[in-house]
Amino acid sequence: MDSPEKRIYIFDTTLRDGEQSPGSSMNPAEKLRIARQLEKMGVDIIEAGFPIASEGDFLSVQQIAQEIRGAQIAGLARANNADIDRAWEAIRDAANPRIHTFISSSDIHLKYQLRKSREQVLKEAVAAVERARSYTPNVEFSPMDATRTDRGYLCEMVEAVIAAGASTVNIPDTVGYAIPQEFGELIAYLRANVPNISQAIISVHCHNDLGLAVANSLSAILNGARQVECTINGIGERAGNTAMEEVVMALRTRKDLFGFYTGIKTESIYQSSRLLTQITGVAVQPNKAIVGANAFAHESGIHQDGLIKEKITYEIMTPQSVGISDSHIVLGKHSGRHAVSEHLKKLGFNLSDTELNKIFVRFKELADAKKNVFDEDLEAIVYEELYRVEDKYKLIYLNVVSGNVAIPTATMQMEVDREIVQDAGFGVGPVDATFDAIRKITGTNYDLLRYVVNAISGGTDAQGEVTVQLKFNGRSVVGHGADLDVIVASARAYINALNRLEFLKRDAGKIKSEYE
């Protein structure tokens, strides 16, 4: 049996730091869906957001805190009373609430960002922890840019915040500057030079600017860290964060070396990765470790021969261990409501009768149009029907004329604020014409940053899944749509992005946490 001192706690910040990745903004329903999945996975702590950033963030964190019972819920707060008070208001109903407060500690940040002395910052750090501690004993403190902070001052700050009541001290590699040997030595140095370090859990938060976030986190574990802050798929600002699935599977696969374990149900990893991709539209690179499309693919004849004879010749873990099924059940037009319901449960979707009815109607429409309906088809339907923002704009009708002679023309009818509007658009191709019609009907003209088409499954009758990224006032959103007709899918994706932008406008004035 695994001993408690060998337990590594997983702190997931997909909903906070991960959401800072360009185009990855999520609405409250999507955040709640991710939080439920994280709870199902066995994540120990969910950082639900930055409550003071906006009213939308506050309400989203509050909703997660009120529903999720199987994980600690953390709210981020800068080292000031207003942030800390607001964070507590958002998370107070959680089964086990945590306030995560932070302040910069490196001389670079003190000089150019805070414009404060070391003494001032130390005093503010202690005061912040004391304030948070007045609400809950579960307080985490982070000295931002710790890897570029003078070690003597870092030790002084860590000792002071632990004395003030911090139960977890997190060491962030904010700019992804450290290398594994150096980062591991830093954790060992803190353990050796902070007298009260045993009174707190040491956590690490690594960024991937040099591609070393996972390696740095593992090095920290070998040197005494017992909590790792990470995100699904490694999503995050700039080059991203520590990928949860990679840390978890490294510890599991090389238990002979590490000797540690997590509480993560690894069979939920792949579904979690797919869900995040569906929601954000941020695709996983094919050669991504653990969850990439090629992670368990072997093309070399020698490798294939070895796998046929004995899988352990070239596979260090099984696809099933991360939730990739080796059996691919296909549904069709004769599949009934119960079969669809049971299949959705296997995919991790426990739907209400009302939700199932919506999905089943879309399923029957799709099954009548194509021979086989695959897992990916069902996932696309579930996302589009159940996890989208409230619609200001809806597609009612689309007809496109195109070819090598005709000028591409799109005639479209939409519902705009419950009013029916019709217009036509022209362009250099059918998609361009469709987008032109949408812009005319909605009176919008945002920058189109990205347009991507993927086949959800194989075959000429595969659904097309389209991702569209639009930019508004320096912020971007991703919309997506799926349909057997790629032009219709494109229209749905563009309209979905517009609806997400409308949500962002309502949540305008959002404050960025600055913490990474």
Curated annotation (Swiss-Prot):
Gene3D superfamilies: 1.10.238.260, 3.30.160.270, Aldolase class I. Its cofactor is Mn(2+). Its main location: cytoplasm. Pathway: Amino-acid biosynthesis; L-leucine biosynthesis; L-leucine from 3-methyl-2-oxobutanoate: step 1/4. Pfam families: HCS_D2, HMGL-like, LeuA_dimer. Residues 8-270 form the Pyruvate carboxyltransferase domain. The keyword Calcium does not apply. It is found in: Cytoplasm. It comes from the Bacteria. Mn(2+) binds at D17, H205, H207, N241. Keywords: Amino-acid biosynthesis, Branched-chain amino acid biosynthesis, Cytoplasm, Leucine biosynthesis, Manganese, Metal-binding, Transferase. Homodimer. PANTHER family: 2-ISOPROPYLMALATE SYNTHASE 1, CHLOROPLASTIC-RELATED, HOMOCITRATE SYNTHASE-RELATED. Belongs to the alpha-IPM synthase/homocitrate synthase family. LeuA type 1 subfamily. NCBIfam families: leuA_bact, PRK00915.1-2, PRK00915.1-3, PRK00915.1-4. This is 2-isopropylmalate synthase. It comes from Syntrophus aciditrophicus (strain SB). The lineage of its organism: Bacteria, Pseudomonadati, Thermodesulfobacteriota, Syntrophia, Syntrophales. The gene is leuA.
